[in-house]
Amino acid sequence: MMNKKDARLRRARQTRAKIAEMKVNRLTVFRTNSHIYAQVFSECGTKVLASASTAEVEVRKELDGKGATAAAATVVGKRIAEKAKAAGVETVAFDRAGFRFHGRVKALADAAREAGLKF
């Protein structure tokens, strides 16, 4: 019997396989109970081009230590878009890592789009 984590990882594997066929940069989101992380991977999937999270000192100061909120995800979305643009990345494929496109994941994606990242 498959538990909740295994089901999420199965969904993530399917998504990553489709993105690998497309040969585009990938914006990956990882969510925990206390933080949210975002990374932009290269087309081959082996190199991290940009990263942002609520665990970063600058973000923690801005959020007063509350890293598990939609507002925190919005800040991370803006930062990852800025860092990706600085690395020369304009378009990405969004990899939600099997998480539902709702709440913090959606807030991060919307903020990244507003900051100019195309996906």
From Swiss-Prot:
Record-annotated membrane-spanning stretches: none
Keywords: Ribonucleoprotein, Ribosomal protein, RNA-binding, rRNA-binding
GO BP terms in the entry: translation
A GO molecular-function descriptor: structural constituent of ribosome
Any single GO CC term annotated in Swiss-Prot or TrEMBL for this entry: cytosolic large ribosomal subunit
Cited Pfam families: Ribosomal_L18p
Gene3D superfamilies for the chain: 3.30.420.100
Domain of life, source organism: Bacteria
HAMAP family in the cross-refs: Ribosomal_uL18_B
Its job: This is one of the proteins that bind and probably mediate the attachment of the 5S RNA into the large ribosomal subunit, where it forms part of the central protuberance.
Similarity-based family: Belongs to the universal ribosomal protein uL18 family.
Record's subunit section: Part of the 50S ribosomal subunit; part of the 5S rRNA/L5/L18/L25 subcomplex. Contacts the 5S and 23S rRNAs.
UniProt-recorded name of the protein: Large ribosomal subunit protein uL18
